[in-house]
Amino acid sequence: MTRRACAAAARHLIASLAGAVLLATPAGAHAVLVRSTPPGRATLAEKPDRVQLWFNERLEPAFSSVSVWSSAGTQVDAGDARVGPEDAKRLSVTLPPLPPGAYSVRYRVLSVDGHVVDSSFTFTIRR
């Protein structure tokens, strides 16, 4: 290969790599749960009156949900899950007075960038 051909190939390779870097989209661009009340795996002495989840991105209200389930498999929340009108990164649901036991919080959210996150965590109310 001539010197001129090597230089042309190197320029082409550099241009291709630069284009790939500039056009790449972030792989981790999706809503991440940053905190919750109650916290995951918490053991509580007090009965919570709601579950609140905060994410690192704004959520699409029509496609975001959270529910709370007993260890017997019964949904126990009030069914009023909603994205906060004053904070589009917060999702909450009201709880009735719950008896002691283990509970599972299940959530599915769609961030405004179009990524769906489906996950869960547990908490326990002490006897």
Language model regions located:
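Short, flexible loop/turn segments at beta-strand junctions in immunoglobulin-like
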Residues: L95-P97
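N-terminal edge beta-strand
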Residues: G28-K47
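Bacterial N-terminal signal peptides that target proteins for export
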Residues: T2-I14
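N-terminal signal peptide c-region/cleavage motif recognized by signal peptidases
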Residues: A24-P26
